[in-house]
């Protein structure tokens, strides 16, 4: 039923935009929790799917201001993870990306009382297999993967992917420049976010980040999710260097 499938995809995409927009509003309002659902109501499946997609970025308003992840959002993310397990990956590369995205969400949830509820019978989640660096994958393929992992570029998260970002800021800068030249603004803003993270971490970066973000703001498609990526990047730029 292709028409039904298309309608469902559109509904889920709209839910992602709505959740990203509310998270962005919370970030702009100073870092409080996003109002994603009314208290004591059953979360509809599209909302849970959107929460699953946003993952650790749901807590960007708190993490960027040094606050702890809030309970209602944590509980909703746990429900989404139970209701919608990780999708079957079509390739080893896709499995790697999904694994690291879930690792980021797990790390944030571990700071809350809901962390153990993600998989109560399992031991603490360990990081997925290491992501091949640019020496192995080449800087172009590596930068594309780093863009897919932009949700990891948040304060309070650290691991092998972050060490790659620290070590290979030139690859991030090359990837962001290439994405801008190709008008691939989604990839560009995500790599600029990583560069902002690296600069906040005290690493020298090989690209002026602010003009890149301003250009994306002016010519971007204006989706809520892209605006959230932009806002997180700006928040990282304004953070005190660690």
Where in the sequence are the language-model features?
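Polar/charged low-complexity regulatory segments
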Residues: 1-178, 182, 186-201, 205-242
């Amino acid at each position: 039923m292709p028409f039904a499938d298309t309608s469902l995809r559109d509904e889920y995409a709209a839910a992602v935009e709505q959740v990203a927009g509310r998270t962005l509003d919370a970030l702009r309002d100073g870092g409080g929790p996003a109002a994603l659902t009314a208290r004591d109501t059953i979360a509809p499946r599209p909302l849970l799917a959107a929460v699953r997609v946003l993952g650790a970025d749901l807590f960007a308003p708190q993490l960027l201001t040094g606050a702890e992840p809030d309970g209602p959002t944590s509980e909703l993310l746990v429900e989404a993870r139970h209701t919608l397990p990780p999708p079957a990956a079509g390739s080893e590369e896709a499995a790697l990306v999904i694994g690291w995205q879930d690792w980021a969400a797990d790390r944030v949830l571990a700071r809350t009382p809901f962390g153990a509820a993600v998989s109560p019978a399992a031991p603490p989640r360990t990081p997925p297999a290491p992501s091949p660096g640019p020496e192995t994958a080449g800087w172009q393929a590596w930068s594309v993967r780093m863009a897919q992992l932009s949700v990891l570029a948040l304060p309070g998260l650290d691991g092998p992917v972050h060490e790659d970002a620290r070590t290979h800021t030139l690859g991030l800068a090359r990837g962001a420049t290439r994405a801008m030249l190709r008008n691939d603004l989604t990839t560009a803003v995500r790599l600029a976010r990583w560069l902002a993270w690296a600069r906040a971490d005290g690493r020298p970066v090989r690209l002026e980040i602010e003009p890149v973000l301003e250009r994306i703001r002016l010519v971007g498609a204006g989706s809520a999710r892209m605006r959230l990526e932009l806002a997180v990047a700006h928040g990282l730029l304004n953070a005190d260097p660690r």
